[in-house]
């Protein structure tokens, strides 16, 4: 493994990528495609965070904007009011904490509180987003590939070679971040399954994911959980896509994904334990940077 692939530098933790990791999804939106409204209160969201950690989540990702196809972005203050109270409580859980947002003001306030990672579906392209992350030394960032906005993106799913074009976009964004002083070891890539892509594009990205990984200077974080393409393949509604989601996560890990972002942590963790038993060299832990009163699972 290349040295630059071995770790993901974040605010409180230097995360080892020597084994595949599981990021648990915490949606605090009323309208997410899969679990909108279930964790709308701070207490419900925190209970969900604790449940995911108990099930084995290596990281948590808290989001207050639904980015399902056709969704409209919430008001900035509304998104902030959804996310920050949950962040304030979840920071004490002892695992790396990510905020899923493109809102520069939410980024700034969350990073000021000590959040480890900004997970941005718009790859820090909104005004002030890049500068906000650059001002916070060691904060991690995940850059996702998407065209347009959630309410327009599916009309922009036109590619000559989706794998090559996704790779080119991600590499170009990394160069922009590096020019702003953000080191590559702070960056993770997401190919954006379901974002400005047809089911055929999504499957091509999975089928050729090993090729994609080899063309990128940083590792992949991949989210297939409960996505529409899985519903088309299986004929199952959103709430019945557990088996399909786990299968896609394993296929992604087998093709080089460093992190899988999932709703169903327990099942994914169990599946990865079996996968690791077949590949026993895939072992690791999350190692925090030296800091007072910080321990890692």
Question: Predicted regions span which residues?
Answer:
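Catalytic domains of carbohydrate-active enzymes, especially glycoside hydrolases
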Residues: 47-63, 255-256
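Catalytic toxin/effector domains delivered as secreted proteins or via bacterial secretion systems
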Residues: 14
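Short acidic capping loops at alpha-helix termini that bridge into adjacent secondary structure
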Residues: 183-186
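Catalytic-pocket segment enriched in acidic/His residues
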Residues: 30
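Active-site-adjacent loop and "lid" segments of alpha/beta metabolic enzymes
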Residues: 3-7, 17, 34-43, 47-48, ...
């Amino acid at each position: 493994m290349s040295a630059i692939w071995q770790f993901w530098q974040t605010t409180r933790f230097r995360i080892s990528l020597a084994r595949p990791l599981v990021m648990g999804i915490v949606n605090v939106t009323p309208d997410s495609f899969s679990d909108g409204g279930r964790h709308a209160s701070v207490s419900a969201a925190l209970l969900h965070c604790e449940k995911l950690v108990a099930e084995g989540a290596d990281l948590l990702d808290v989001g207050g904007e639904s980015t399902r196809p056709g969704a409209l972005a919430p008001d900035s203050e509304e998104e902030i009011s959804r996310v920050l109270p949950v962040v304030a409580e979840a920071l004490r859980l002892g695992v790396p904490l990510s905020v899923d947002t493109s809102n520069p003001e939410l980024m700034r306030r969350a990073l000021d509180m000590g959040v480890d990672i900004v997970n941005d579906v718009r790859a820090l392209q909104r005004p002030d987003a890049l500068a906000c992350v650059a001002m916070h030394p060691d904060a991690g960032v995940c850059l996702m590939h998407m065209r347009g906005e959630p309410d327009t993106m599916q009309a922009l799913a036109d590619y000559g070679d989706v794998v090559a074009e996704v790779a080119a976009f991600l590499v170009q964004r990394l160069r922009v971040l590096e020019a702003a002083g953000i080191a590559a070891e702070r960056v993770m890539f997401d190919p954006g399954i379901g974002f400005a892509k047809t089911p055929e594009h999504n499957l091509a990205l999975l089928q050729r994911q090993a090729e994609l990984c080899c063309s990128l200077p940083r590792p992949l974080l991949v989210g297939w959980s409960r996505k529409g393409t899985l519903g088309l393949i299986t004929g199952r509604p959103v709430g019945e896509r557990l088996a399909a989601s786990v299968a896609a996560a394993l296929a992604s890990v087998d093709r080089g994904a460093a992190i899988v972002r999932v709703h169903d942590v327990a099942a994914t963790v169990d599946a990865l334990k079996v996968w690791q038993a077949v590949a026993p060299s895939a072992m690791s832990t999350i190692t925090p940077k030296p800091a007072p009163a910080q321990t890692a699972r």
